[in-house]
A protein has these predicted regions:
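Oxyanion-binding and handling regions
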Residues: 1-19, 26-37, 44, 79-181
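A short glycine/serine-rich beta->alpha loop
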Residues: 22-27, 55-59
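DPxDG-like acidic metal-binding loop motif
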Residues: 52-81, 86
Length: 181
């Protein structure tokens, strides 16, 4: 399990919904340098029967690093690769600790935006589409899910169907195509 969509970089080796080993660090922009050594330090070099990767939304570069690494390892090891949403990971961790039927996850999306998505507990599922809203337009009420980034260890709690291992950016890229005149 690989999580690089936020300021954190975390990995976990999970077997039968049980975390065998994990590592996590808040790295900011250092995902590319930290990810592969973290995986290599897991038992068996981190080799697994399947790879799950956080597809975002979150850090543009962090998402690309995680998805590219997951795809490369999956190809090299001959194992399937699947994705999940960083917001679903946060919701799963919340439900594991709280007796609530629903939660709305709000994370900082950068560029003055926040990503917002509600989830239901059983089965863990989205109850509305991902929204990108200006940071000053959000009023958060009710229970607080916490300020920390998602952690790969919580992937064992996910029950939703996996996503294809493709980035979920949450907004259009800042780079714009140039048109020759």
């Amino acid at each position: 399990m690989i999580e690089t969509a936020t300021a954190a970089c975390s990995v976990a080796l999970i077997e039968d919904d049980r975390v065998i080993a994990s590592d996590a660090a808040v790295v900011g922009r250092g995902h590319a340098e930290r990810l592969m050594p973290m995986i290599a330090n897991l038992p068996g070099g981190g080799r697994a029967d399947a790879i799950w990767v956080d597809c975002g939304p979150g850090s543009f570069t962090g998402i690309r690093v995680g998805v590219a690494a997951a795809r490369a390892l999956g190809f090299g090891w001959g194992v399937p690769v699947a994705g999940f949403s960083s917001l679903a990971l946060i919701a799963a961790a919340w439900f594991a600790e709280h007796d609530e039927d629903a939660v709305t996850v709000v994370i900082n999306g950068g560029h003055g935006e926040q990503f917002v998505q509600p989830f239901a507990r059983v089965p863990l599922r989205e109850t509305a589409a991902l929204m990108s809203v200006p940071s000053d337009a959000v009023v958060v009420t009710g229970p607080r899910a916490g300020d920390g980034p998602p952690d790969a260890r919580h992937a064992a709690l996910l029950s939703e169907a996996p996503l294809p291992p493709r980035p979920i950016y949450g907004r259009a890229p800042d780079a714009k195509p140039l048109v020759a005149t």
